[in-house]
Structure formats: C-alpha cells, structure tokens
C-alpha cells in the first residue's frame, strides 16, 4: 500500500461529483481517492500500452503523472495508440499526451520527459515516482527500468504485446521477482520481444494490456493484496482466454545489480557487442576478402517479403532447435540483422554463447533501405 498516511485533502464539489462512482465503492471511498490523488506514476512510453494506461490513470484521479517518450506521432501509430488523431501526426507524443491528459483531468500534475530512458537518466527520472509502468518494447529499456526500480525500491508494472497475445506482471513488489527473473525462465522462441513494427499486433490488444497495467497500479495504491507479483498473466485475443504462470526465482532477488546497464544485455548471458553499420557492411561485402554468411533472423514471412541479397533466413524461434547446425557457422563470420535491432541483439548473444564469430548489423534492414536503398536488396514482386 502506498501513501498509508495520506493526509485528508480538500475536495471541491466538482471533484466530489467527478469521483462519485469511486467514493461510493466501499473498497475506495474518500480515503482511497485521497491515496490516488497523492500518488505518482511514471509511464515509460506513450504508445500502444501507454495510451490506455495514461487515459485511465488520469481519469481515476492520480495526482502526478510522468511521461517518458521522445517519439513523433506517425500515421501507423493510430491503429492502436488511442491518445492520438490524424491532427497530431508529426507532433511529439509526450507533448500531445500531456495535452490530452489535461483535457481529461485538468487537476492532474503532468510532467513530460521528451527523451529516451537510458542508463544516464533513468535513476534521476524514476526516483521521482512511486510506480513505474513499462510501456516499452525492447530488451534494453526493460532491463534499465528493472535495475533502476530495484536500486530505488520502486514498483515495476510490466506489459508486453505480440500479434494476438499480451502479458502483464508486477515486478519488484515487496521483495517479489524482478524482470530478469521472468525473462531468464522463458523459452527463447517465445521471447524475441519483437516490436509492433516488426511482427504486427491486433490494434485493440494494447488497449486491454495497458488497461490491466493501470488496474494493477491502482490496486497497489489502494492496498489490495491480489497483485500480480510472481505471476505472469497471459491474454490471448483469439481465444478470449487468460492464463496465469508462476515466475521461478533464478537468484536472490534482493541483491543489487553489480553495475547499471550501460550496454545491450540479454538476461545474464551478454557479451560486448561487436557491430557495424550498413555502410561498413556494404564495404565488407564488396571486398569479399573472407568467408562470411549473412543471417536474417526475422520470421519466414518477413524474409520472403524482402531481404538482403544472399542472406540466409534463421528465425529466432528456430535457434533453440539448432537449425543452424547445417550452416557451418564455426567456419565463417556471421553478419546478423533483423528489421531494426531488437531481434538481432537477442540472436547475437545466443550465437556468441555457442562460440560463433558474430557481427551485428546496426539498424537492420530498415537502416539499409533508408541509407543505401534497394541495392543488393531482394523485394518480393506483387
């Protein structure tokens, strides 16, 4: 329970009317509403998950809300990021999110951080809030949030979406598991943590998962005991079903991290990343002075749509099955790419663990098409 000594605050007639449906609930009443008003929540990411979470947190009467996001609104966001409209395209997500929140609840104190959460700023930002809602979609950001919350003793409410499935959990709650405990226990093939742009997502799915994250935050503030600590709640939109899975602890969860995240990490099996940009890759391919193989670690469907010339498709889900054994990777250098970065980081660490010579291509196929164009690029004809 947060704000267990919440002081009685003065409510206007408008506020009594606004929160009247809360005030008549015996589980909330005036005391619970005061807890909400005196609490602070930081939402890292104002996209698919952040949009519904921010809307309902503001409407519920959270007193202070922080938003971390440096993205610009794109038309492709509108399918799932319900805070934004066509009139907002090209504008800052953080700025527009604040504007919309204040339209919902003008009494809310909204702070925006128009930046990306990184190891150099995470502690300073996160320390200002009681609860952190994780609306990110990549390994690095989630580990930074997890480690910062552990250091500052903050609650980390995790959410993730992939195609038609989503999951929610609460980490670092009263000595419970953290994100690293969960991530180190799930199957590689189910955990490339692809972004929506990489793998697609049903538009309404983040609305469900983001709302569940906001619900967890409110329950914690009000002191409810039925929190998703040590449990992953998984939702399948195709079958309209929920499942719960227990998280197995992999280490003493209260131990502080030896150092903050300063590089790309995957679980506890990380390596100094050897990487090149697409210009350097192009030059290496022209020289052709050593034995190499280009590995496209995206899905088969993405590979068939477009891929680099002579690239071999090795989806992440197939790595656990050792489908790479016929490629003789031990005899050559492997250049790895995906759509942007997230899956190639995962693949890099996995193959390095097998002691293969691996180089990651920064920015992936997206960077290649933006900088180099269609040269040495196969694109499926219509």
Swiss-Prot record:
Record's keyword terms, sorted: ATP-binding, Chloroplast, Molybdenum cofactor biosynthesis, Nucleotide-binding, Nucleotidyltransferase, Plastid, Transferase
Binding residues for ATP: 48, 69, 76-80, 93, 137-138
Keyword Nucleotide-binding (UniProt): yes
SUPFAM superfamilies found in the cross-reference section: Activating enzymes of the ubiquitin-like proteins
UniProt pathway: Cofactor biosynthesis; molybdopterin biosynthesis
Pfam families: Rhodanese, ThiF
Principal EC category: transferase
Family listed: Belongs to the HesA/MoeB/ThiF family.
Stored PANTHER family: ADENYLYLTRANSFERASE AND SULFURTRANSFERASE MOCS3, UBIQUITIN-ACTIVATING ENZYME E1
Record-given protein name: Probable molybdopterin-synthase adenylyltransferase
Species for this entry: Porphyra purpurea
Gene (name only): moeB
């Amino acid at each position: 329970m947060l704000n267990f000594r919440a002081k009685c605050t003065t409510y206007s007639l408008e506020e009594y009317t606004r929160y009247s449906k809360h005030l008549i609930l015996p589980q909330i009443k005036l005391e619970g509403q005061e807890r909400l008003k005196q609490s602070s929540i930081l939402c890292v990411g104002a996209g698919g998950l952040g949009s519904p979470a921010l809307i309902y947190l503001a409407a519920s009467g959270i007193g202070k809300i922080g938003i971390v996001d440096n993205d610009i609104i794109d038309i492709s966001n509108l399918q799932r990021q319900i805070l934004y409209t066509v009139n907002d395209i090209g504008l800052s997500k953080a700025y527009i999110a604040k504007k919309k929140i204040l339209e919902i609840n003008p009494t809310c104190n909204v702070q925006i951080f128009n930046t990306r959460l990184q190891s150099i700023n995470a502690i300073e930002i996160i320390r200002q809030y009681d609860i952190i809602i994780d609306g990110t979609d990549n390994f690095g950001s989630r580990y930074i949030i997890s480690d910062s919350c552990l250091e500052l003793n903050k609650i980390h409410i995790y959410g993730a979406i992939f195609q038609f499935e989503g999951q929610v959990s609460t980490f670092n709650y009263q000595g419970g598991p953290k994100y690293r405990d969960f991530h180190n226990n799930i199957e590689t093939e189910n955990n490339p943590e692809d972004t929506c742009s990489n793998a697609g997502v049903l538009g309404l799915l983040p609305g469900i998962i983001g709302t569940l994250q906001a619900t967890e935050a409110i329950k914690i503030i009000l002191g409810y005991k039925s929190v998703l600590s040590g449990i992953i709640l998984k939702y399948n939109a195709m079958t309209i079903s929920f499942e719960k899975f227990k998280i197995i602890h992999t280490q003493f969860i209260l131990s502080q991290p030896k150092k903050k995240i300063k590089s790309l990490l995957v679980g506890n099996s990380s390596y100094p990343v050897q990487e090149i940009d697409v210009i350097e890759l192009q030059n290496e391919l022209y020289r052709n002075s050593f034995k190499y193989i280009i590995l496209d670690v995206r899905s088969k469907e993405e590979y068939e749509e477009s891929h680099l010339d002579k690239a071999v498709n090795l989806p992440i889900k197939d790595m656990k099955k050792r489908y790479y054994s016929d490629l003789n990777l031990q005899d050559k250098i492997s250049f790895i790419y995906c759509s942007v970065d997230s899956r190639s980081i995962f693949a890099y660490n996995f193959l390095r663990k097998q002691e293969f010579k691996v180089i990651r291509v920064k920015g992936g196929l997206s960077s290649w098409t933006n900088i180099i164009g269609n040269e040495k690029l196969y694109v499926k004809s219509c």
